[in-house]
């Protein structure tokens, strides 16, 4: 399936690494996310700036000059520019500071509240399960456990094996 067809189906993806156009400004990166849209994207850009105020401050700065956490916010924002039904996040907090991690999780919750489905692969299992409606524990690529985020957090075997006790 062509990428534009996936976008038209409402799917958006934020990769873990190499997730911004480093030679473009923050705003140009966001505009790239809205490239296939036929409507006016300015309202969505403003929504992204409301979600990530630091991006508005840095909108004319090259994305290549940003910190890892700020780049992650640009990538997240660019994906939101497609107005997705489902947002897929690959390790959204990898390599970011604890403060940025907490902020990203808060923003994920905000996006989820708008009705966008979130499919996330995340190294910080405890925090991810804390916001998850549904969770899956994979071992060697196979589904080992599944349940609500709360069920998995409270499962003694999951806690011992995957959550540090």
Stretches with model-predicted labels:
Residues 1-3, 26-43, 51-56, 147, ...:
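ABC-type ATPase nucleotide-binding domains, specifically the catalytic core motifs of the NBD
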Residues 102-114:
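Helical segment within the ABC ATPase nucleotide-binding domain
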Residues 87-91:
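Catalytic Walker B motif of ABC-type/P-loop ATPase nucleotide-binding domains
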Residues 1-18, 22, 41-45, 57-60, ...:
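ABC ATPase NBD coupling module
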Residues 83:
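Conserved catalytic motifs of ABC-family nucleotide-binding domains
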Residues 62-66:
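Conserved ABC ATPase signature
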Residues 79-80:
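ABC ATPase C-loop
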């Amino acid at each position: 399936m062509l990428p534009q067809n996936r976008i038209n189906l409402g799917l958006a993806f934020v990769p873990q690494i190499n997730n911004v156009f480093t030679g473009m400004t923050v705003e140009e990166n966001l505009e790239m996310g809205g490239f296939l849209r036929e409507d006016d994207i300015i309202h969505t850009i403003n929504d992204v700036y409301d979600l990530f105020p630091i991006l508005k401050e840095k909108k004319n700065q090259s994305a290549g000059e940003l910190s890892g956490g700020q780049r992650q916010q640009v990538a997240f924002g660019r994906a939101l520019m497609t107005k997705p039904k489902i947002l897929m996040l690959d390790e959204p907090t990898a390599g970011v500071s604890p403060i940025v991690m907490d902020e990203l999780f808060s923003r994920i919750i905000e996006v989820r509240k708008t009705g966008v489905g979130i499919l996330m692969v995340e190294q910080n299992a405890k925090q991810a399960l804390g916001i998850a409606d549904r969770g899956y524990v994979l071992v060697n690529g196979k589904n080992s456990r599944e349940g609500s985020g709360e069920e998995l957090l409270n499962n003694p075997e999951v806690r011992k094996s995957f959550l540090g006790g």
